[in-house]
Each structure stands twice: as structure tokens, then as C-alpha cells.
Amino acid sequence: MEDDEYTTSKMEEIKLEEGANDAQVKQETNTPMSITNGDHESSRSPTASQDGLKSRSESADTPSSNRPSKLSRKASQKLAASREPVLFDHLPDMTTESCKFFQRIPDCLYGSKHLGSTDNDALDCECRDEWHDGKNLACGEDSDCINRATKMECSAEGGNCAGGCQNQRFQRKQYANVSVIKTEKKGFGLRADSDLQPNDFVFEYIGEVINEPTFRRRMIQYDEEGIKHFYFMSLNKSEFVDATKKGNYGRFCNHSCNPNCYVDKWVVGDKLRMGIFTSRKIQSGEELVFNYNVDRYGADPQPCYCGEPNCVGFIGGKTQTERATKLPAATVEALGIDGGDGWDTSVAKKPRKKKPDEDDEEYVNSIRPRSLSEDDARKVMAALMQCKEKWIAVKLLDRIMQCDEERVIHCVMRMHAYQILKTTLNTFIDDHNVVLQVLDILDKFPRLTRNKVQDSKIEATIEGLTQSEHEDVASKSKHLLNEWSKLEVAYRIRRRKFDPNAPAANSFEERRGAGREEETVQSTSKTASPTPIDAPKGPRNSMPQRNNAFFQNGGRSRRPPFNASLPQGWFTAKDAAGNTYFYTKQGATTWQRPTQPATEPAAKAPSKAMKEQLAIQSIINQVTEKGTPKHTSVSTPKAAETPPKEVKEEKWRSLPVDKRMKIYENTLFPHIKHVLDKFHHKLPKEELKRFGKDIAKKLVASDFKNNRVEDPGAPLSDKQVKKIKQYVKDFLDRAVKKYGEHKRKADEDADTQMKDDQGPSAAGSGAGSVVDGSDGTALAKVDGTSMGEVDVTAVSDREGTGSLGSPDRKRKRDLDTSGSPYVTSTDGPNMKRLREDELEAPSPPPPPPPPPQSDMDEVVTAEQEALREQEEALMRENEEAQRLEDEASHTKGLEDVLDASNEISRLNKEARKPGSQKMPA
């Protein structure tokens, strides 16, 4: 830009039409700069700088030096599709450095309470909760969730999907794994640090939500401050998100003519929020870019450095804006005008050019939309819910009216049709044509039950229309209310809500209940996970354990890290929204991280009445045990059989834990021995015996620790036996393999030692002799087999276990176990869970319900207090800008009235002059 006058004139050319929903406004000042989202300078080439200063009349002819050769539309699409993605793995991570240019804030700051607000009530989806491994997988990407289809997040408080579902990405801040890089020409950009799937959530576009007067003032203010890059995004009509000084990493997403991301708006609670999503599968290392798709730079084009085959060579400019619409892609799809010829605003050459003096409404009216399909119905309802432009709402409603297919109409009704149409009525209540369109659609819907009408509360809105001055509106409103009054309410049995934190009565009930829960889950596009394995779960799964970081740790938490140790007596849990709270065994809960150990309540001394009751009970017990007469021979044999059976069933419950473990070990060992016998010719007998004992002890310890044993003497099921045998076989196969490798190595070491010694003693080394291995470890040779170090880690100390050789050799073997090359019972992924279970602390008690939400609001950190003060300052700025705007409008109105009055006075004076033939009216 050459001077401030050019900058001011260019700002005046910025269009603030509602159609520019996805506008991101950037303003360049004195120094010619590349169009980038970075907060730093990057020089243009000399040619680009000169060409960027061309006048408005020359702007249509973009310099060829900056512009690649033109390709046909089909050729450019083929090149873009076949081109391998460019990776930026070689660039350093500049995330920390990029934070120096702006203030990171966790959420948008609103200039007033009504900014960003929507008229939609919190709507409930029809999904059913799908609990797997403690996580609710309902409302996922592949589900048929109507909230997700209409771009609305489910409530954290829970509904049909039981809360905590997968359609809460904005609320949980489940951002993608990205980093900030510094490109050669475009400045800062965003790089994917892991593979991303289509429609993955990258970032919410966060900043200060301001009104239009504040937006205009800031454009001038930033220019005076010398700020090179502005970051404005149009959120709604006369509402903007300004991420210039405050925001998050989403502000660094650059422009591309062949984007891999798109910007979309979602309803989250009572606010409309903007997010960046992936449009295709993205490899790790790719830059994340989207198409700005709007005239933000006046009539003069700015060079585009995306480097794509279909690059038009510039961003903005007269040529591009004549041929492209500023409507977002989602609205274009909802209008049904992205048909066979395509709707590609990034390609300069189009089948049908937009006339220079033609606006978006005229352009859309000239294109015939395609017929409504089920997929289109979802897009139409999603766009209609957020629509504030009357002409767009009319086109969307007309698409619904023109549809006569019953299945499509049912799909429209399913997409919260009554609630969305109620919002449309309230938005355009003063326009009789729009109201009549909505009433005709409501009358067209099939009427089966009264449920949807009653739940949407649309009757109250229709009731007000019965008194309308417009006869058609009043009559149709009365007709609808009369028809709805004849419908009956269908009652449904509410589904039982599954509480993942509720403890089961016992481990067997927990497994069987989980299995039934999974069997009853019905999903149109998901496959239920297999039924959990019954006890004992020795081998469990061979796959390594991983935590689901995408769902739990996707966002950057403002709280301290919770993996640090808590004070004694405190435990953590998460509510349905994913917020972490803390609790004690006594049920005390708090949102604030505790710093002191939980105080144990002092044991209350028994009262006098309690002492007397205990004494009486003790006497009764003694009399019962000693004074009960034995059964005489008179008793019938049948009567004598029942009590011993009951005693037998209850006997094991009175035994100590070690006795129960021994009984359970005897139950497991026959199945373990069955596999051991098949390896008697592969491993020494004594070692096999020791392996069997240690494996049995390990399985017993694990099952008792995890409460998987109900009756230690009960026979095992076929499934349990199969799992145990498979685990023992896998373990012994690895033992045989390692045994053979070590035997071969020991033999080679022995031969080498014999050659070195050149003596008869070395040549005669055999059974029971000791040789030095290459690693300096003493190896016991038994019939040419080195088994001294074959050992397994037992759960507890063992005495009398079978071993080889003398006690000295046993002690040596115990000392060398850690360095033994042989497999142990803790080797391999199959035993990873068992080992982790032993090292874990005792399981915490089940968490109580979370504290009230009001308590969470009271926990205000210093950062939150600072953000609150900044938001209050932003509110004052918006109010001041609005006040000045209103005063300017009022002053202009007075000036117009004064000018009109002066003009009338002048005309009157002229009329009174001599010779005047006409008096002014």
C-alpha cells in the first residue's frame, strides 16, 4: 500500500453483507506484505510488490509473473486430485515463538450478552448411549445423530444419549494435534502432527466477538497502530470474531485454492460458534489450509502463494469477485445449486460467470436448484437453523415445499423440524410471505401423534398468529391449531440410564450386565464390541494398553495436570461434561484441587445402649454355639442331608484368603498341567513343574486382586479353560524358543573355552560342571542343558519348590534372574495387564455425584479473573462504539431534515420571486 489514503479507501470498499458469512478480513498497511495469517513480516518479490500497486482499472489483469498458466477447470481438478500432498516435517516447531504476537484465550470474549446468541432451545437427539470401556461412544461421526446432522452439539447434562457423548467437541476442546510453523512466503501456518480423518475438528476460531461499529473502529485503529494483519471472521449478521490480538492457534490457518479444511458454524448451547474442520484425509506433516472465498482486499488483487495447480494467482481482486459468490459452501449445498456443473469458487474459469453488477441473490435465483434428497434435507435444516438472511430462508423453505417424497419429508421432520421452523417464525414474524411458507410446510407434514408438536412448544407461536391482520395467516394458523388439537400423545417407556460409575453387586454381575448392555446397543453404522471375557482373565488382550487421548486429553486443560499425586485420601473423577472433580471416601466433593490430606473422621465411641446390645448379642451367640443339641439318630436321613450341604457351601467363605487362593489354584492346575504334559520332551521335567506352579500362582493372584473369583472351588467354564490353555501354550512356546537359543550359545561358548584351555579338564567338561559364558555369567550345565537361569517371577516367596543342584546353585540362580535371557511369566504383552494390576494402588471407592455447577463457578483463578475483566472492558468498548454510531446516525438524520428544510425554504423563496408561475407544494 502506498499511503494511508489508499488504506482508508480500501477499508471503505470492504463489504459487510450477511452473505459473507465466512469472511476473514485482513488489512495490509504501508509495507507490501504477503497475504498470511502470521504476525510477522515476509517480503514480497519486487515484481509482486509493483504489480500489487496497480490501479483499479488495471486490477482485472493480474500480472503473469505472479499468476500460473491458466488451466481448464477439469484439468486443474485432475492435477489437484493426483498431486501428492506437500509435507512440512522438516520445518521447526514455532508454536512457542508464535505466542509472542497475540494473547491466547481459552474461549471467546463477548462484547455483549446477546452477541453470538441463537434463538434455538437445547434440543435432544434420538441416539442411545453406547458405553464401551467406560466411554460413551454415542453420537459419533458415523452415527445418525440428528444433532450432529444439524450442526448442533449435544448437551453436557445428558439426554437420550446419556451425556458425555462424542458430539461435544467444542465443549471439550477436542482440538487436533497440530503445531505452528513458519513458511517461506506465507508466514506462520498450521501443520498437522498426526494423521487426520475427514470432518475431524481442528480448532475453534476464538477471539473477541464484537458488533459492527466496533469492527469499523478497530479497522481504523489497527491501521493507525501499524498492525500488518487483521483477523476478522464474520460470525453472524453484524457480528464478527476478532482474533487479531486475542485468540488461539486457529488464527494461523492460511489460505489455499485447493484447501484441505473448511470453516463451519455450530450451535453450542445458546451460542453460535465457529470451527475449522478437515475436508479430506490429511497426512501428518501437511499444512492445514482453507479457502477464504471472499472479497476482503478491495478491488486490487493480492498474490496467492498456495502453489496449487488450480491456483488463480491472487486473492481478491475484481476478476475473482465478479465470478465468485461470498456464500459459504454449506449454504451453497443447502440451496442445491452445487449440481453437475459444480460450484467451485477457487477456480477462476466457471461454466456460468457472475455478472459484475449481479449480487448473490440474483445469481442464486438464476440457477435452478436440484430436487431435495434425504442428504439435502439434513443440510437444509442445518442451514435454516442458523439463517438470518430472509432471501436465503425463502429459498430453503421453497426447497422443502417443492418436495413431495414421503421419505424425504419424514427426514425433514426428524431433523428437529418443528423447533427449527418455530425459530424461523420468530425471526421473520413480520414478513407475511415467510410466515405463510412456514405454515404451509407445517400443514404439509403428516400428523400421527402430538409429541413433536408439544415438545417444540410451537403452538404458543402459532397462537399469536391467529390474531394477525393478514387473513390467510390467521386462517391457516387456526386450522393448524385445530388439527393438532385432535392428535393424541403417544407415551413411551423411558430407557434406563446406564451409570458407568455405579458399582455392580459383584464381578460376575458386572460382566454379565456389561455383556447385556452391549448386546442391546443398536446402531445403524457401528458394530458393538465383543462381549467381555469371563473370569479368570489371565491373558486378557495381547494388544498393548493405550489411553484414548483424543477423547480425554484432546483439549488444553486450564487446570493443573491431574496425573500428579493427590494428597492422601483424595481421588479424581469426571462428570458427564468431562470436567474433573475431587472426592474423598466420605463423599466430600470439590472442583478445586486439594492441597491437604483428607481428614479421617474420628471413630465414635459406642453409646451405652449399643454396649448393652452388643453384650446381649455376645451371650446369645455363646449359648447358640455351646447349647445347641446334636442331631440324634431319630432324625431322618433326608433331614440330615440338608444342613451339611449348606455348611459346605458356606465353608469356603469363612476361610482366610490364602486358603481360598490355594483352593482356586487346585482348580486351575489340572488345566495347566494338561498343557505342561505336552512339553515334557522339550523342556526338563523339574523346570516344567516349576513353571506350572509359578504360572498358577500368578493367575490366582491376579484373579483375586481384581475380584474375578466368586467360588474358588466351582468348575471353570469351557471359555475360561480355553483361555488358560492358550496362555500356557504361548508362554511355553516362548520358553522353548529361548531355551534353544541359550543352549546353542552355551554350547558354542563351551567349545571356545575348550579350545582356549587346551587341557583335559576343559575337554572333559560335562554334566554338573560350570563354565564361564561370554558375558561372564556362571552357567549351570545339566546334561548339556543350561537351565540354571530359567525362572519365573512368583507372586510370593516359595519354599520347597523343585530346583536343580545344590542350595548354592539355587541362590546363584535367584541372584542372576534379572539378567537371565530366558522368558519369565512376566514377559510378553499377554502379562502386561497382570504386571500393571500388581503395581497399581488399591482401587479408589466409587465416586459420588459431582459438586453443584454453582460451586464450580465460584472457583475463579487469577487467569479467569483477568479474562473476566477483559470481557467487561470489551463490553464497554462495544457500548461506546454503538453509542457513537447511534449518535452519528441521529446527527445525520437531523442534518438530512435540516437540508430538506433548507431546500424547501429555497424553493419557496424562488417561488415568491416576480415572474414565478408556480408555487411549491
UniProtKB/Swiss-Prot annotation:
Residue ranges the record marks as coiled coil: 858-894
Enzyme class label: transferase
Biased composition (Pro residues): 842-853
Annotated binding of S-adenosyl-L-methionine, by residue: 292
EC numbers for this chain: 2.1.1.359
Biased composition (Basic and acidic residues): 508-519, 741-758, 865-895
GO cellular component: chromosome; nucleus
Protein's UniProt keywords contain Transferase: yes
Keywords, ordered alphabetically: Chromosome, Coiled coil, Methyltransferase, Nucleus, Repressor, S-adenosyl-L-methionine, Transcription, Transcription regulation, Transferase
Subcellular location: Nucleus; Chromosome
Residues covered by the WW domain: 564-596
SET domain ranges (all copies): 176-293
Region (Disordered): 1-78, 346-365, 503-565, 624-647, 741-921
Main location as per UniProt: nucleus
Biased composition range(s): Polar residues: 24-37, 60-69, 521-530, 542-555, 624-636, 817-828
Domain of life: Eukaryota
PANTHER family membership: SET DOMAIN PROTEINS
Swiss-Prot/TrEMBL domain comment: The AWS and SET domains are necessary for transcription repression.
Role this protein plays: Histone methyltransferase that trimethylates histone H3 'Lys-36' forming H3K36me3. Involved in transcription elongation as well as in transcription repression.
Protein name from the UniProt record: Histone-lysine N-methyltransferase, H3 lysine-36 specific
